[in-house]
Amino acid sequence: MRRLILFLLALTLLPIFRMPASAQMSNMPEDLRARLAEINPTWGKDILGNVATTLALYTPLLAAAPKDGVRIERDLAYGPDALHRLDLHKQEGRTGMPIVVFLHGGAYVRGSRSVNTEVYGNVATYFARQSMLGVNGTYRLAPAAQWPAAAQDVGLLVKWLKANASAHGGDPERIYLIGHSAGATHIATYLYHSDLQEPNGAGIAGVVLMSGRYHFDPKPDDPNLTNFQAYFGTDLTRYPAQSPINYVKAAKPMPTFIVISEYDNPDLDTQGALLFGALCERDRACPRFTRMELHNHLSMVYQFNTADDALGRQILEFIRRGR
């Protein structure tokens, strides 16, 4: 049945998948394009090694990227834990700005909002340069924190922004959450598990979910199986109740943008397709969907605030249109 669903989804998404790479990445430097073409075909064989290589490619590009006019307020606490921290990226003197929150990945057990001086501040800086309030946050990690702790942290962060964002020029009625990998899973869990929300709802205006996991059925050869189990546990009978996708039908509609990369971590591309299909079925209208051609699981995030801003422009349009 799952193969049939994926086949039908593939037919639906074929026009997107056939979009020429030049249409998505016309501003990518040729030398970077060439290096990614070398790295990407081996992505799943050495994920951590390829992450390090990709980071080394992008860090100097991001160091040279424009940041003029963006001020950063660092290490603000949105909750009681040491990992309940966020940085605000903004232009001074602006009010009523849409708020764009980025939550990093890290296979549930690692990750930080500051991998180095450039990543992942590049995401919040990009949106600050577009006259928005950029938020770069982190959350609790396994094994110290287990499901649904990180999704609860998403709720804490939203609650903090509701109370404090206006003092920093943000509009608390226009909060958009962007999550990558594990960060996308935590946002989806918060969005679709209504018991994790305030009584009046999620309190957000839209979500961008980048290569997350939404249906929990990990395979024995999944390279992140041990990390997955550290957060979600080893009891397979609990996975259906934990899976965000199983709550889509009952959830309130929310503007959603699903993103995957051409060279993604095993199963995360099909996870995006499954969520896309579930939302199409529920809403009788499909959400925005993009596959980032020639990008891998990390370059899809590292590219923010570089000359290759195709995804950034799509997110800006998503925010403007509300879909």
Where do the language-model regions lie?
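Mobile cap/lid helix-loop segments that gate and shape the active-site cleft of serine hydrolases
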Residues: 62-65, 212-247
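Short beta-strand/loop motif that positions the catalytic acidic residue
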Residues: 251, 258-261
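Acidic catalytic loop of the alpha/beta-hydrolase fold
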Residues: 216, 263-267
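Primarily recognizes the serine-hydrolase "nucleophile elbow" in alpha/beta-hydrolase
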Residues: 156-222
